[in-house]
């Protein structure tokens, strides 16, 4: 029988889960107001009054609510996004950055702010209201919420398309360093060309080519996506459809692409990858994606489980996969040999080789 203490712990855990969205909204508030940047610009811990003064300077017409800001900062300090320390002389709290909030600085190369604003945007939040219904009826929460798939919305709405591209580019910068380090020999061994399938605006292939100038980079995505891409040295932008044809290359790379699609769709994409590299002596496909370990305790194992449910809300049939599921998927598409390379960052690198 549960003790009174156990029952209270259980109750507290449900309360915490129930209101977990408050953490996300407080985080969004801090990003929207640029609070990490305000603290960073001072070069020292700041008071709430100094934060308010900076907000007034940035937006002269604003009238910041100091009570709200103080309470929001109190929660974010508790969540370790900021620190606070009482200044003895002034008897005011001084706020400073932590290792977490340093990832929210807009001028930093490693800035997760666009992704925070993406995931907390009403368009992305609305599908979650349909998760239970869709679990009963086997339908798509995003289509229920918006009447179309996320890719169709991006095609129809240029503003949303740019928003999506910015978030995806942001996700790239968080992992590129670890990827270049952990797969250095793999990139060095590519004889000539590398096509980034679903490469968005080309930021990841640009970084790979910059680190390995012998590689001829091809950024491949839908025409309306590459139309907004900047020019990068050694990178050619190509518009097309990965479900129809993929440009020939010595190797193919896909970052967080296959988790957006069903096994059937992934098989089509992978077979097109097979055709793209089949004439090459050492052709291979490099998949940067999650490899689920449901019982794992590493830094990002829990995030894999979260992303798996995230795919339900954002895509029609996307999902994260265990190594056993990857093995079946790759084998069915003509890739019987593969290696899983775990990195310190969230996704793994899967090297797949044709027969």
Swiss-Prot record:
Activity over temperature: Optimum temperature is 37 degrees Celsius.
Q: Mind listing the UniProt keywords for this protein, alphabetically? A: Alkaloid metabolism, Methyltransferase, S-adenosyl-L-methionine, Transferase
- Stored InterPro entries: COMT-like (IPR016461), O_MeTrfase_dom (IPR001077), Plant_O-MeTrfase_dimerisation (IPR012967), SAM-dependent_MTases_sf (IPR029063), WH-like_DNA-bd_sf (IPR036388), WH_DNA-bd_sf (IPR036390)
Q: Which residues form the active site?
A: 259
- Enzyme Commission numbers on file: 2.1.1.291
Catalytic activities: (S)-reticuline + S-adenosyl-L-methionine = (S)-laudanine + S-adenosyl-L-homocysteine + H(+); (R)-reticuline + S-adenosyl-L-methionine = (R)-laudanine + S-adenosyl-L-homocysteine + H(+)
> How does this protein's activity depend on the pH of its environment?
Optimum pH is 8.0.
Q: What does the record say about tissue specificity?
A: Expressed in capsules, buds and stems, and at lower levels in leaves. Localized to parenchyma cells within the vascular bundle, but only to those cells distal to laticifers. In roots, found in the pericycle within the stele.
Residues the entry annotates as binding S-adenosyl-L-methionine: 197-200, 221-222, 241-242, 255
Its assembly, as annotated, is: Homodimer.
Indicate what this protein is called per its UniProt record: (R,S)-reticuline 7-O-methyltransferase
Naturally occurring in which organism (per UniProt): Papaver somniferum
Q: Which gene encodes it?
A: 7OMT
